[in-house]
Amino acid sequence: MAAESDVLHFQFEQQGDVVLQKMNLLRQQNLFCDVSIYINDTEFQGHKVILAACSTFMRDQFLLTQSKHVRITILQSAEVGRKLLLSCYTGALEVKRKELLKYLTAASYLQMVHIVEKCTEALSKYLEIDLSMKNNNQHTDLCQSSDPDVKNEDENSDKDCEIIEISEDSPVNIDFHVKEEESNALQSTVESLTSERKEMKSPELSTVDIGFKDNEICILHVESISTAGVENGQFSQPCTSSKASMYFSETQHSLINSTVESRVAEVPGNQDQGLFCENTEGSYGTVSEIQNLEEGYSLRHQCPRCPRGFLHVENYLRHLKMHKLFLCLQCGKTFTQKKNLNRHIRGHMGIRPFQCTVCLKTFTAKSTLQDHLNIHSGDRPYKCHCCDMDFKHKSALKKHLTSVHGRSSGEKLSRPDLKRQSLL
């Protein structure tokens, strides 16, 4: 007991904020930066661990390649992407209210869930304010002339900026299955917001006048996510606001989809491919799923072994371990052996380390190179155990066994087959 009383426990309340400030200072001095992000040819120096913790998209890119240079092309301006990445260090984001939708779309592409939630909440708030202002315009004029308190309240609301905060005490929503009653409430909310959008005269939501000035700025304070969620491995789930019914994936699905599709259609020429990412090895990962957000965003990861689907890749990977499967983060293909996954990833990255000394052709696997060398040497090492045929390639033997003998290469011989082979 005496030994336990001698232990002193220190809790540093501002440790996280102080560390982020110091890392941002080091980033500005270009010290210890291990990655360069190119957003529409605009360079952003940063640290992989910080960017991966705040953006699921960036984390997946870092897992796919060890390159120090990652290139991203977005339909929004490069400044939008730069501010989003900078918010990973500062915990705050200044957004002009008329540009909320631009940041919402870009943050959705970068999978910065906490920013998407706050932008969605702010956007829905201003839509509600605009609708109420239209319906009660005459009544408001009468109240302003008769009630000085209401007039002062309106004057206070006409400010240049608004501060929206995510408190550290906000709980982390780790229940990805929305209850039926919550889903019904959410559906009615989304339908009301959609109908309000249709009533507006402007065809594009990002330029619609919803009752604020062009120079007004909305400041989003993004505090650190609760440590309880981090300990449980839930990196992608945001801190929920007081409006618990605003569930991220469904809300984003309803508010972003039509705008993303219209913006992709507006891009002229050969830019209609949408959003994509490029690494230094020259491999591209097209993101055409953004154009089809309405069809598959709610359950982007479908298990190949069971009917379960998942929104976040962390939960999907954890589930695949139960089936003893390995996932390729680039194309979503699964493998039963890790070595096959590594070989598959080398194909994505264009790495072909095995070269034929005769014709200089390169391959991703040593076994493939060996089969290729059989062409030059004339060897036919793969023997059929059912007949006298032999083959240069293992794949040709498998095809022969399946099509001719109706069996797989690993299937054991029956007794008559063994007797026939012994006679031969």
Swiss-Prot record:
Query: Its Gene Ontology molecular function terms?
Result: DNA binding; DNA-binding transcription repressor activity, RNA polymerase II-specific; RNA polymerase II cis-regulatory region sequence-specific DNA binding; zinc ion binding
Which keywords fit this entry according to its UniProt record? Answer: DNA-binding, Metal-binding, Nucleus, Phosphoprotein, Repeat, Transcription, Transcription regulation, Zinc, Zinc-finger
Q: Where is the BTB domain?
A: 33-97
Does Transcription regulation appear among the keywords? yes
Modified sites of kind Phosphoserine: S202
Q: What does this protein do?
A: May be involved in transcriptional regulation.
What does the entry state regarding organ or tissue expression?
A: Widely expressed with highest levels in brain.
Q: What is this protein called?
A: Zinc finger and BTB domain-containing protein 6
Compartments reported by the entry: Nucleus
ZnF (C2H2-type) spans are: 301-323, 326-348, 354-376, 382-405
Region Disordered: what ranges? 402-424
Q: Which domain of life is it from?
A: Eukaryota
Species of origin: Homo sapiens
Primary site of residence: nucleus
A Gene Ontology biological process annotation? regulation of immune system process
Q: Where is the composition biased (Basic and acidic residues)?
A: 408-424
A single GO cellular-component term on record:
mitochondrion
